[in-house]
Each structure stands twice: as structure tokens, then as C-alpha cells.
Curated annotation (Swiss-Prot):
Species in which this protein is naturally found: Helicobacter pylori (strain ATCC 700392 / 26695) (Campylobacter pylori)
Membrane topology per record: Multi-pass membrane protein
Catalysis: reaction(s): a CDP-1,2-diacyl-sn-glycerol + L-serine = a 1,2-diacyl-sn-glycero-3-phospho-L-serine + CMP + H(+)
UniProt similarity note: Belongs to the CDP-alcohol phosphatidyltransferase class-I family.
Protein name: CDP-diacylglycerol--serine O-phosphatidyltransferase
Subcellular location: Cell membrane
Example GO molecular function: CDP-diacylglycerol-serine O-phosphatidyltransferase activity
Amino acid sequence: MPINPLYLFPNLFTASSIFLGMMSIFYASSYQFVMACWLVVASLILDGLDGRVARLTNTTSKFGIEFDSLADVIAFGVAPSLIAYFYVGYNFGRIGMAVSALFVIFGAIRLARFNISTNTSDPYSFIGIPIPAAAVLVVLCVLLDNKYHFLEGNTEKLFLSFIVLLGVLMVSNIRYPNFKKVKWNLKLFILVLIFLSLVFVRPLEALSVFMGLYLIYGIIRWLFLMVKIIFNKNKSA
């Protein structure tokens, strides 16, 4: 059965994401953490392109969705969990192993839930923090420590706790913004230009601030909604 060559194009981005994820694992296993971490960030870019290319070329398919999920497990599940383990987790023996394994398991659950709820969920938000965002937050911590050296003693335990938190957030019902259907205007265009300029000047710091704000936004929004629900219940009681 002949295959439309256009269908190969978005899947090429997905395959490239798997390749970078595997390269990240290889670099992490040889303790070249900076390269390993930036390869995960590069995988994030490819992950953002494959779906958009598929929609632009009208080549979305069930195979592409499943292939993308498998790629995400490798690039954003296995790769960052092994980076975290080889960087800090091994100091804690089986606890470090368990934390790294749980991150992958929660990420896989997050992806499976996303795949079965794609047609029914809110197109403007994700349920649970996306696994690519969680992965990038992990590797940004490693990159920041490689530059500023803040992971020492008890802060290493905090790093492992942070990884567990990210795993829980992936399978939670906390909603996070989905940037797939952004309505562009002049104000947003200017903000994106400013952000890209900051990334050009200080890529690590700019990405860390942006991802940190993204993480906190979902939690604060959830807390606000919980307080609002409790207030409304008390008011009606």
C-alpha cells in the first residue's frame, strides 16, 4: 500500500526527538550532563513542531499520535529521569532509583490519559503538567546547578522531592495552559520578541524563569479555584 510522503514529514520530527532523547541518555551515562540536558531541551522544540507540521500538512494520524507518545516517554521520561539519577539520585541508593522510576511511570500515565481524552478535554488547557514541561524543569535544575552550584547536602533531597512533585503534578487534575491555539495580537507578539531576546542573551536563566512561572501558575490557579469552591460552599450553607 503506497504511503503519502507528506505523512513521513511530521514523523521525521518525532523520530528525531527519539534520537536526541537517546543521545541524552548516552551523554548522561558518561556524566556529560550539560550536553545531556540541552538535548532534552532540543527534543522539546522538535516535540512542539511535529504536531504543528502534521496539522499544517493535514497529515494527522492515529499512528502519529501513538508514535509521538512513545517518543515522549523516551525523550521526556527516561532521559531526564536518568540525568537526575546519575547527577544526584545515585547518592540516595534505592530511593534515588525509585524517584527516577516513578517519574517515568507518572509520565507514561500522563501521556496515556492525554491520548484517551484528546477529543473531550479543553483545547486551551492541559490536565496535569505536560511531561515535556516536567522534563525541562528537571534538566534546567541540573543546568542551573552546573552553573551556580546550589545542589549540596539537603538541597539534593529537595531536588529529589521536586522530581516527585513534578510526577504528581503530571497525573493531577491541575490545569496548565495549552499554547497550541494561541490568538496572536500585537501585545503577545511584542512579549514573544522580548522573551526570545532574553533567551538569546541569557538562555538558561530566561528559560528557567519562564518554566518556573509556568509551573507556579498552574498551582496558584488551582489553589485559587479551591478557595473559591470552599467559599461558595460556606456561603450556600
